[in-house]
Amino acid sequence: AGEYADELANLGVRVSNLEKKVGNISWSGNARMRWVQGYDGTEAKDKYDGRIKITAHADVNDSTYVQGRLRSDMNFKDSKDANTYMEELIVHHQFGDKVGVTLGRQDLTLGQTGTYYDDEFDGIIATFGSDKLALDLGYGRFKSWDLKAADGSNTEAFLGRLYGSTGRLSYDAEYINMAYNQGNVWGLGLTANITDKIDVFGDFYKNTDADNDPQVWTAGLGFGHTNWKKPGTFRVSAQYIDAEKGSVFGASTYNVSPIDEAISKTDVDYWLAQ
């Protein structure tokens, strides 16, 4: 309505009246079907499953919104009912242009690639800054990390992230401190755009609380950029991943890879193309 305010005014229609009639809730979603190769030793079994996600976003006022995401999973190899649950539920409040706070179960991707973590975070994250340089300070639980205290309770963690972009570079530095000395992790990531379509990228993380300070790193080369709003766009990439035993806790962005074997079983190193 705002784009055609003058034309509507000439017709005697008040834009403000139209805006009052527009709902403050928006919906979006996606669905997928996939086949996944198993990597759990001799008992590894391939999976063929489906998933649908529906997100609802509601503006409370100009500074606050509530957002929730429902997820339903099903396995095409059995006859069980789909498992439907609330995957994300957050409240976000913006204090001016450069300070915001998000409370609840929220998406969290670490590094340039998500190799170290790409899943939900249960807690609070305060964000300071802008797209060029921002600081996140958070406290809560990494949902997919199976970390327990001596009494069996879940382990909280402090998260600090400094990230941004300038020119052809995108960068981040991260620190994670877990309760009961279960992890003290430092990480760095960098993406350099060589041209408008070609980039090199990498991440590095080290856990200084584990024996021998195990580390995980990845480096790769990518071509193209996927934009879901633009049909025909695509991206292909290849990267090398090296993860020492005890360097990761799970929930990598790569579902079809053996990186979870490095949680407690063995070192892994491999090439990944996508």
Q: Predicted regions span which residues?
A:
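Disordered, low-complexity tails and leader-like regions
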Residues: 1-12, 38, 88, 104, ...
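N-terminal periplasmic/intermembrane-space "pro-region" immediately following the signal or transit peptide
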Residues: 1-32
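Short, intrinsically disordered, low-complexity segments enriched in Ser/Thr and Pro
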Residues: 5, 135-137, 160, 268-274
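Domain-scale macromolecular recognition modules
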Residues: 24-100
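One-face residue pattern on beta-strands with alternating periodicity enriched for small/polar residues
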Residues: 30, 51-55, 69, 88-92, ...
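Outer-membrane beta-barrel pore domains
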Residues: 34-47, 76-81, 94, 98, ...
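Surface-exposed coil loops of outer-membrane beta-barrel proteins
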Residues: 75-88, 93-187, 246-264
